[in-house]
């Protein structure tokens, strides 16, 4: 049975840590489905780890729908949250249209958007229409050209603003909030003041849960590993070794072998090629 919004709130109420990970396709979603991870984020981070862009800004709503559909085909247990990408929710009306597309066509169970007090009216409109919304505060990747990639909330004014933003999102009906790249003590304080769950990334252990990028934790991304993540496997090296071995065996003609091939009756092949058929007692099968 798929994770429900009520399950997420119940986990916070019980003090059970929430686990969330990104997934971008059918295969990664299937692998998550083999675990007990209750939340999948189809993040616009795909712009970087899938498309090779330097930020999430170029990602479009149609691309998000495409990847969300693929994830939904591979997932049967997790609550799947789809990102609304840059400039896809500049007005409540546009947000409704694109969030609706992400849920109706993509199939996800909720959407995520970046912003605080300024986005609260949009969040309220979405929630009133039955669209579950996850907020996102702190470092907001879609604003990277304005704020840069650095820790947020380190001044009195900014810390207060983040708290106000979180309270506004909760009041507007958001079911959870991602807190990214903010001081751990501030994230813990915000979490304590909210009734809804917080999910951290680079925000310390005081949040109600954690989200990490698939490629980072599995060692698939060769670029610099951010301080706020941890590599749990080195699949990049494993894949490189496998590809190198595959290429070697193909060049040395040790792959494919007879076990990897099909056979055809020798006389059938000879007749098809207009050649003399084999004599009785000769090998009746030819590998192809």
Curated annotation (Swiss-Prot):
Record's GO cellular component terms: cytoplasm
Family: Belongs to the PanB family.
Reaction equations catalysed: 3-methyl-2-oxobutanoate + (6R)-5,10-methylene-5,6,7,8-tetrahydrofolate + H2O = 2-dehydropantoate + (6S)-5,6,7,8-tetrahydrofolate
Residues binding Mg(2+): 44, 83, 114
Superkingdom per UniProt: Bacteria
Protein's job: Catalyzes the reversible reaction in which hydroxymethyl group from 5,10-methylenetetrahydrofolate is transferred onto alpha-ketoisovalerate to form ketopantoate.
Listed transmembrane segments: none
Species name: Herpetosiphon aurantiacus (strain ATCC 23779 / DSM 785 / 114-95)
Complex and partners: Homodecamer; pentamer of dimers.
Binding annotation for 3-methyl-2-oxobutanoate: 44-45, 83, 112
Protein name: 3-methyl-2-oxobutanoate hydroxymethyltransferase
């Amino acid at each position: 049975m798929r994770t429900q919004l009520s399950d997420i709130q119940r986990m916070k109420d019980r003090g059970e840590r929430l686990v969330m990970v990104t997934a971008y396709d059918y295969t990664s979603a299937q692998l998550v489905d083999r675990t007990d991870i209750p939340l999948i984020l189809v993040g616009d981070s795909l712009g970087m780890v899938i498309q090779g862009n330097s930020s999430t800004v170029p990602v479009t709503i149609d691309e998000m729908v495409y990847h969300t559909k693929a994830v939904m085909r591979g997932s049967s247990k997790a609550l799947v949250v789809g990102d609304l990408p840059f400039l896809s929710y500049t007005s409540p009306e546009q947000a409704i249209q694109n969030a609706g597309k992400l849920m109706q066509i993509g199939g996800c169970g909720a959407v995520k958007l970046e912003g605080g007090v300024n986005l609260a009216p949009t969040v309220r409109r979405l929630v009133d229409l039955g669209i579950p919304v996850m907020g996102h505060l702190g470092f907001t990747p879609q604003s990277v050209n304005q704020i840069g990639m650095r820790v947020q909330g380190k001044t009195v004014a900014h810390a207060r603003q983040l708290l106000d933003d979180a309270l506004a999102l909760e009041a507007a009906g958001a079911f959870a909030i991602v807190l990214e790249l903010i001081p751990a003590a501030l994230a813990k304080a915000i979490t304590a003041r909210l009734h809804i769950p917080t999910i951290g990334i680079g925000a310390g252990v005081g949040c109600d849960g954690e989200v990490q990028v698939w490629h980072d934790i599995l060692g698939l991304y060769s670029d610099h590993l951010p301080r706020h993540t941890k590599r749990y496997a080195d699949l990049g090296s494993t894949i490189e070794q496998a590809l190198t071995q595959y290429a070697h065996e193909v060049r040395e003609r040790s792959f494919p072998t007879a076990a990897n091939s099909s056979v055809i009756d020798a006389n059938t092949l000879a007749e098809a090629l207009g050649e003399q058929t084999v004599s009785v007692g000769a090998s009746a099968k030819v590998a192809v």
